[in-house]
């Protein structure tokens, strides 16, 4: 009976296989939770945006300045300021006035402005970046129609110039955690089943020769 108990013990290779399977299962579950809570909501809002044609109504600075954070090395950080420019457009789908934003991230970071420049240490460089962007919309785009994206149910008063996420990125972010979970389950189940079959075969052999 003692020998039969010993035969149920897993070998070092089997133990490593089960540990690997459990690691993949836990990693897959944690990845799904992380993506679900931290990334899924803004991504779905972005993907729910409908494409439309927009034309510029006005481009202007509103006289307010906002802070941004710049980096100047590994342990070097600071804040500087940039002026707020607003680009109002006409949305062809709803035929209404809306504030243009670069993308979903910019909208969530500063919903009052249309553009956030790459943050530099000098305020003057930030102002120049905003001015160049403002002139681009005034002179080069003007009244030309362009593609924009809006979500009538979430933020009908805002439109996006581009989407940050697409369906392929969303698929990959959920595909690989699920694959890791399934592979982990298969490794654990197959290892346990293989061990169980080996133990049964050993028991049958002992009964046969006893």
Curated annotation (Swiss-Prot):
Per its UniProt record, what InterPro entries does this chain match?
A: K_chnl_Ca-activ_BK_bsu (IPR003930)
* Residues with attached carbohydrate: 53, 90
One Pfam family cited in the UniProt record for this chain: CaKB
Cytoplasmic topological domain residue ranges: 1-19, 189-210
**Spans through the membrane:** 20-40, 168-188
GO CC terms in record: plasma membrane; voltage-gated potassium channel complex
GO biological process assignments: action potential; detection of calcium ion; neuronal action potential; potassium ion transport
Membrane-related topology note:
Multi-pass membrane protein
Q: What do we know about how this protein assembles, alone or with others? A: Interacts with KCNMA1 tetramer. There are probably 4 molecules of KCMNB4 per KCNMA1 tetramer. Interacts with FMR1 (via N-terminus).
What does the UniProt entry state concerning the protein's domains? Answer: Resistance to charybdotoxin (CTX) toxin is mediated by the extracellular domain.
Query: What protein am I looking at?
Result: Calcium-activated potassium channel subunit beta-4
Q: Which organism is it from?
A: Mus musculus
- Which gene is the coding source of this polypeptide chain? Kcnmb4
């Amino acid at each position: 009976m003692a020998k039969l108990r010993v035969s149920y013990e897993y070998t070092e290779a089997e133990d490593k296989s089960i540990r690997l399977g459990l690691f993949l299962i836990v990693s897959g579950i944690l990845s799904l939770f992380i993506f679900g809570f931290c990334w899924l909501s803004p991504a779905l809002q972005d993907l729910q945006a409908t494409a439309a044609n927009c034309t510029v109504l006005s481009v202007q600075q509103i006289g307010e300045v906002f802070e941004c954070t710049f980096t100047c090395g590994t342990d070097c950080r600071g804040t500087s300021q940039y002026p707020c420019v607003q680009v109002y457009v006409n949305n062809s789908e709803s035929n209404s006035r809306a504030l243009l934003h670069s993308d979903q991230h910019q909208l969530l970071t500063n919903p009052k402005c249309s553009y956030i420049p790459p943050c530099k240490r000098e305020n003057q460089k930030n102002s120049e970046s905003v001015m160049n962007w403002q002139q681009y919309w005034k002179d080069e785009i003007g009244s030309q129609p362009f593609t924009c994206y809006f979500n009538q149910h979430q933020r009908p008063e805002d439109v996006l110039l581009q989407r940050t996420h697409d369906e392929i990125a969303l698929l990959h972010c959920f595909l690989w955690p699920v694959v890791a979970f399934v592979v982990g389950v298969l490794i654990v189940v197959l290892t346990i089943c293989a061990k169980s079959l080996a133990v049964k075969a050993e028991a049958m052999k002992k009964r046969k020769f006893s």
